Amino acid sequence: IALNIAQEVGIERIVYLSVIHADRYLNVPHFAGKYGVERMIEQMGLNATILRPAYYISNDITIKDVVTGYGIYPMPIGDKGLAMVDTQDIAEVAALELIRREESSVPQPLNRINLVGPDTLTGQDVAEIWTQVLGTPITYPGDDTAGFEQNLRQFMPNWMAYDMRLMSERFLTEGMIPDAGDVERLTSLLGRPLRSYRDFADKLVSA
């Protein structure tokens, strides 16, 4: 509905928050839904920026107590690597794109931007970061996606927990790997270094 109305009234300043690899993780429901919106934007000829963020670093706020209390990093993210991104960086890029489109004297064409962090991290990498931050050993117990789903069912609908499990299984087989030049492009766009997982962990522990 929103895209049809945008087309009818001639809105030229559209920034859509999709997800990295939306065109590849097609068995993951919320990825497939976002890719459907991307296709609509493209096929309708809308001038938009499509932002494709990787795994949100701030997702891990929810497992701080598990890390500090049990000495494990429980998210089944595997060993391919995820280019985890800070949501503040996402918000800043979105704002910059809206401003760029607002200030342009001519309509700006469709473009896609992968939003990634400075590091592509495995489960072992993240456990090591927590070990350094806390000064106590933190281990990565492995890739139990079924157990991950069962745990999520305690506080979200079953269908959503299943969706999350499917996503985590794709983490294990493909990861979330940035394209060549993504990190440099974002660093140039923001005019500063990208926020890292270590920055997040330090801040969370000191809060």
Regions found by a protein language model. Give the residues of each.
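Short secondary-structure boundary segments
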Residues: 18-19, 179
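A hydrophobic C-terminal alpha-helical subdomain
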Residues: 107-108, 146-207
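Oxidoreductase cofactor-interface core, primarily capturing Rossmann-like NAD(P)-dependent enzymes
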Residues: 4-13, 19-139, 143, 150-151, ...
